[in-house]
Design a protein with these regions (language model features):
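C-terminal and inter-domain tail/linker signature
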Residues: 1-123
């Protein structure tokens, strides 16, 4: 499996480069995140949500990657001001190696709520 898009996506995420992140996602990407009530479908739907997140998050630090035949999972840390949380992203890749499905899992819950509150105040 070609992971060039995954590596470029994570580098863009660490730079907080929205366009760079989106360029490594399939047009029909599906995002499931604790920061939205339902699944977001397509790059146009993701853009404002991810842009808002990048405005409030200070850093993403990737710690470990796990790989299967058509997916990659990443364990990482997130810092937003004095808030720190752990995250796991599950990325299902298409044949071109673009991310076509992304499921975001964050913990602990109080930190997730605090980041969501920061997003609400920033909008």
């Amino acid at each position: 499996m070609n992971l060039s898009h995954v590596h470029a996506f994570t580098a863009a995420m660490q730079r907080k480069d929205l366009d760079g992140m989106l360029s490594h996602m399939a047009e029909n990407i599906v995002l499931k995140t604790p920061l939205a009530a339902g699944a977001l479908r397509g790059k146009d739907a993701l853009r404002p949500v991810v842009a808002a997140l990048l405005r409030v998050v200070d850093s993403f630090v990737f710690r470990e990657f796990l790989q299967g035949p058509h997916h990659v999972s990443a364990f990482f840390g997130v810092t937003a001001g004095d808030i720190e949380l752990d995250g796991v992203d599950y990325w299902r890749l298409n044949e071109a190696g673009l991310i076509e499905e992304m499921t975001v899992l964050w913990r602990p819950l109080p930190a997730v709520v605090a980041v969501n509150d920061k997003l609400d105040r920033a909008s």
